[in-house]
Amino acid sequence: MFGRTYYCGEITEKAIGEKVVLKGWVQKRRDLGGLIFIDLRDRTGIVQVVFSPEVSKEALNVAEKVRNEYVLSVEGTVVAREEGTINPNLPTGKIEIQAERITIINEAKTPPFVITDQTDVAEEVRLKYRYLDLRRPVMFRTLQLRHRVTKAIRDFLDGEGFLEVETPILTKSTPEGARDYLVPSRVHPGEFYALPQSPQIFKQLLMVAGFERYYQIARCFRDEDLRADRQPEFTQIDIETSFMSQEEIMQLTERMMAYVMKMAKGIDISLPFPRMSYDEAISRYGSDKPDTRFGLELVDVSEIVKNSSFKVFAGAIANGGQVKAINVKGAADQYSRKDIDALAEFVARYGAKGLAWLKVEEDGLKGPIAKFFTEEEQNGLIRTLEAEAGDLLLFVADHKTVVANALGALRVKLGKDLNLIDETKFNFLWITDWPLLEYDEEDGRYYAAHHPFTMPVREDLPQLETNPEKVRAQAYDLVLNGYELGGGSMRIFEREVQEKMFRALGFTEEEARKQFGFLLEAFEYGTPPHGGIALGLDRLVMLLAGRTNLRDTIAFPKTASASCLLTEAPSPVSEQQLEELHLVVNSEKKSEQY
């Protein structure tokens, strides 16, 4: 074999006349009777190789045996393509290689799907043969983008004086948040490690240790129900700083994101990012992670309709609820009664009991509920919703949470269905002024809105144990195009405040000591004020790559059932392994192994 001199996708007209050596995979082979054309592919792209008897009968004979995905080494001369054969869709489309020698490095079975960007093969097949799926150029480009993003983050933070420090993967299980992945200890029978849901406690301990500026491209693990933008193991950009204010951390994050966008995508973004309070986001968009690339904002019309004869609206308001509406501009003729019924079924998934509607015509409002509103009420709706002839008004009446969830989801659906979203935009947004705690009706207790180490707003501290739902957090989330990129906060750094927080979350003194005693003790040794942020790398790459599935940004992802179709993990283990770990599997359906 002979050493490579060029990558396939990097040969240009400047190389015409040169002898080159290429290595790669056969993308396509065409036999034109006496001439064979092979599209040779490597990670940089494709180049056309021509085998002819005039140049080398021996090479032509070998080329006749070649099939798709064979691995080849080819030596030949770069020549210009003839007029009429130029391919403007290829960077190498003006040249081709006249092959003089060819070596079949390895043969290949016929793949279960064609190795091209466009494929309609089931995702399960792609995941089972992930090594073939990753040959598709679109997959390589996505992972190449991931590399550029990660490199840009490291370069930026290094320039800001941050140290990359690795924290433990085998750690202690804590009860907050999602379920832990547990790892049994062989040397400590009946005891378990947990895989980290985040490096949260360790990065705070690094601040106690005086490192001041830490970051890590951290692997994290959560045993939770999955969806398209979740994975059981994921990667986050983890940052922690001492002696910096919330404002300074947010500005640092903005500068980092601007650097990443420039280095990874060649895009300039404007700073600072817009900011919106949590309450405003819920009020205007029905979401704490709003997509601001399009309108369709929620408008509260409760005051206008509270005394109307439409009992659904009046009753909801009388019971402490609200009525909100979305004005879908110019959509009155686009939605039939059947279409609106389908939208009603959609909002029902989010708890809404119905979807009321009105169409705006030149002489007023029309629709099944129009008769219940006086002329003054109709004019009030038209004025408040800035409605014009041809608009479609959609209403939900219920408790505030149901209204926000239902109309927030409907807003996103309408934005997609009506092509209102500018897919070329990257709209970053800070969500601030979060509640510190959230009350769970089922469990009858409070949970941390972010995590138990978030610092409350100082002036709200006296209410932490008496009126916890009123306490605000020094927390901030970064949103991009309707996705939560990540969240950050100032951290509790005083033992007394941390103990108050644990009590508000329902921990007994003994439980807090058992779970977090080491952290509470650390706070007694001169802990600096500190804060940070964690951003989802997988999700960031998904958005920058224009993908809709998180699995497309990870080399070897898990399915929605947290399994790996390639390696067939998780899998049973031997009886001997279980004995060494002091474990017994309690299952009616045991594998034959057991």
UniProtKB/Swiss-Prot annotation:
Binding site for L-aspartate: E176, R222, H450, R491
UniProt-annotated binding residues for ATP: R222, D223, E224, Q231, E484, G536, L537, D538, R539
Function field: Aspartyl-tRNA synthetase with relaxed tRNA specificity since it is able to aspartylate not only its cognate tRNA(Asp) but also tRNA(Asn). Reaction proceeds in two steps: L-aspartate is first activated by ATP to form Asp-AMP and then transferred to the acceptor end of tRNA(Asp/Asn).
EC numbers: 6.1.1.23
Organism whose genome encodes this protein: Geobacillus sp. (strain WCH70)
Gene Ontology, cellular component aspect: cytoplasm
Subunit structure: Homodimer.
One Pfam match: tRNA_anti-codon
Main location: cytoplasm
GO terms for biological process, alphabetical: aspartyl-tRNA aminoacylation
UniProt-annotated stretches for the region Aspartate: 200-203
Compartments, as annotated in UniProt: Cytoplasm
UniProt keywords, alphabetically: Aminoacyl-tRNA synthetase, ATP-binding, Cytoplasm, Ligase, Nucleotide-binding, Protein biosynthesis
Class in the EC hierarchy, top level: ligase
Gene Ontology MF term list: aspartate-tRNA ligase activity; aspartate-tRNA(Asn) ligase activity; ATP binding; catalytic activity, acting on a protein; nucleic acid binding; transferase activity
Catalysed reactions, as listed in the record: tRNA(Asx) + L-aspartate + ATP = L-aspartyl-tRNA(Asx) + AMP + diphosphate
The name this protein goes by in its record: Aspartate--tRNA(Asp/Asn) ligase
